[in-house]
């Protein structure tokens, strides 16, 4: 038996891959690596810092923290127009619900038999009577009342995202 040397010794099963096809998996791996890297970065941002670093920003100088907001006041009673214009932006007169809560916390009902606070009434002359925490408008209010300025503090969207993930994972 003679061997034939005239042709290839084997037949390929599939045609050779083109160079363009060989690069597609490399691009896919780079994309997957970028996604995994971004996920690891977000996970590190969520898990590594303590919860206290994701809290609300502190109140400005001269303001007191009150729940999720900041308050400042002057104990001198003023007229409504002066009270409305006396709060520096972004602050406004304290909202009615926050004023009732502040009155209950400071127990001003026990200390005073009369007195009023101006509250935010969206342009309407609105006040809160301290003795019983009843709010009213116009004639219900006295001419002079105490101005309490208030501005809310709220965390940004990413902070809410981080705290919700930490809560879901049961992290302190």
UniProtKB/Swiss-Prot annotation:
Segments on the Intravirion face = 1-27
Pfam families for the chain: UL45
For this chain, the family text in UniProt reads: Belongs to the herpesviridae HHV-1 UL45 family.
Identification of the protein by name = Envelope protein UL45
Locations listed in the record: Virion membrane
From which source organism is this entry? Human herpesvirus 2 (strain 333)
* Swiss-Prot/TrEMBL keywords: Membrane, Signal-anchor, Transmembrane, Transmembrane helix, Viral envelope protein, Virion
Top-rank taxon: Viruses
């Amino acid at each position: 038996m003679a061997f034939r040397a005239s042709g290839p010794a084997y037949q390929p099963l599939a045609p050779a891959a083109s160079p363009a096809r060989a690069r597609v998996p490399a691009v896919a791996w780079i994309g997957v690596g970028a996604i995994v890297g971004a996920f690891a970065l977000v996970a590190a941002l969520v898990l590594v810092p303590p919860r206290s670093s994701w809290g609300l920003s502190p109140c400005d100088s001269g303001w007191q923290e009150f729940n999720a907001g900041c308050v400042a006041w002057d104990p001198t009673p003023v007229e409504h127009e002066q009270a409305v214009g006396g709060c520096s932006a972004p602050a406004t007169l304290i909202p009615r619900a926050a004023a009732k809560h502040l009155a209950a916390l400071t127990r001003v009902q026990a200390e005073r038999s009369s007195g009023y606070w101006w509250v935010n009434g969206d342009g309407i002359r609105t006040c809160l009577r301290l003795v019983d925490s009843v709010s009213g408008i116009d004639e219900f209010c006295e001419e002079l009342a105490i101005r309490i300025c208030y501005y809310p503090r709220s965390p940004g969207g990413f902070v809410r995202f981080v705290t919700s993930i930490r809560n879901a994972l049961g992290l302190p």
